């Protein structure tokens, strides 16, 4: 990740360099756009767009980890994500990284057997699912509560 600019042929020195402020600024801008795309897709009830934003965020986080030499996506998280993707879901790390916490969204059209197979695969890999649900706030319109 070099700020989105092609710098030509990479040398060993280029690959070993420390990330610069431009690299991180590029990551932040791309992350901001990814969040905006996610929110827009949620507002439009566009599951394809939601899944695309989740996948894009994963790619950005993996790139940041590679750029900084930091483990963001552990082997366990990689297994969680790859098996979710193989079963029609979209997934990414959650939190600061390295802590084996991930978010998985599954297509509501997925079959029960696909979901059961996914959960069995996770169980064999010692991945534990937390059964969480989205909370819908009371009377919220455009991010402003009627109680305010």
Residue ranges with predicted function:
Residues 1-92, 103-148:
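C-terminal nucleotide
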Residues 100:
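Conserved glycine-rich beta-strand-loop-beta hairpin in the small C-terminal domain of fold type I
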């Amino acid at each position: 990740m070099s700020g989105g600019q092609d710098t030509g042929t990479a040398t060993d020195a280029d690959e070993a360099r420390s990330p610069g402020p431009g690299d991180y600024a590029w990551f932040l801008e791309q992350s901001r756009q990814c969040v905006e795309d996610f929110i827009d897709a949620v507002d439009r009830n566009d599951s394809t767009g939601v899944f695309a934003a989740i996948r894009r965020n994963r790619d950005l986080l993996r790139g940041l980890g590679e750029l900084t030499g930091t483990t963001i996506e552990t082997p366990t998280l990689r297994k969680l994500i790859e098996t979710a993707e193989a079963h029609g879901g979209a997934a990414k790390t959650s939190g600061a990284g390295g802590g084996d916490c991930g978010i998985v969204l599954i297509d509501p059209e997925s079959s029960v057997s696909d979901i059961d197979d996914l959960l069995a695969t996770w169980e064999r890999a010692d991945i534990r699912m937390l059964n969480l649900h989205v909370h819908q706030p009371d009377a919220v319109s455009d991010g402003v509560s009627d109680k305010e």
